[in-house]
Amino acid sequence: MKKVLLIFLLVFLIPLSACGGVKYEFRDGVIYEDEKEATGTFEFKIGKYRTKGKFVDGLPDGVIEEDYENGSIMMKKFFSNGKHLKDEIYYRNGQLMSTYLKDKRMDIFYDDGQLVMSFNLQTGKSSSYHENGNPLFVIAGTKSTLYNENNEILFEVENGELIDTGTILKELEDGTFEILKDNKIIAKVDAKGETITYLYSTGEKLMTSSSVSGDTEIFFKNGDTFFKGDSENGKWFYKNGKIFYEFYKSKWRFFDTEGNQILSNFDEITDIKKID
């Protein structure tokens, strides 16, 4: 999940653009005009989206704004004399998708305003959330905790060791197992002990995890997938089933509510123009 923090880095891939014989390029976060650090207001494309901002002595200053095709704001990146301060990412309907305060905090939202994930960059704590706003999965240092929608702990691990939360393992006649807490079934385990399925308080499937493949899948209460992946790749989904965010090793992509890619860390920068 920490990989999701990469979305807020301004990645410049050294594309070139010629305008009236003048050559512009981005290199290591600096904009150059005929090999000299440039000052002025520039327009360019990141992927297919138009971006505009002011640069002073090659460094971004003020607000760098990226827009959707219809002209609505997709992202604002705030700088002061080249220092990155914060980011705001928006859905097409104007609702915040994400806020990022450099070195402090990041929050990610669905288009209805629901908080999906949060990251405290000072403590290293990361959290994902149920639809009712309660924490779902929390990582704090070496401790990981899974909660049901009523904020009740289903399991807790620290330093790779399972913490006793008062659960009981019960074997059934067919060789499968149930995990009980306070005389209530909170999880089920297959006969081989390879796949465990944690449950919502009302019995719906919340999360499945395989000790063989390493695959994990988390579900909304209606049964649709919220997340699926392993240690090297993962996908998060909107409530409508469309993909929201995807990472594979060092690559990542963000998508709008219709499943269209809007941001990635491998977008090319093209069509650089100085407008002021």
Tell what function each PLM region has.
Residues 14-276:
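Glycine/tyrosine- and acidic-biased, solvent-exposed loop/turn segments at the edges of beta-strands
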Residues 7-15:
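Bacterial N-terminal signal peptides
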Residues 1-4:
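Positively charged n-region of N-terminal signal peptides that target proteins for export
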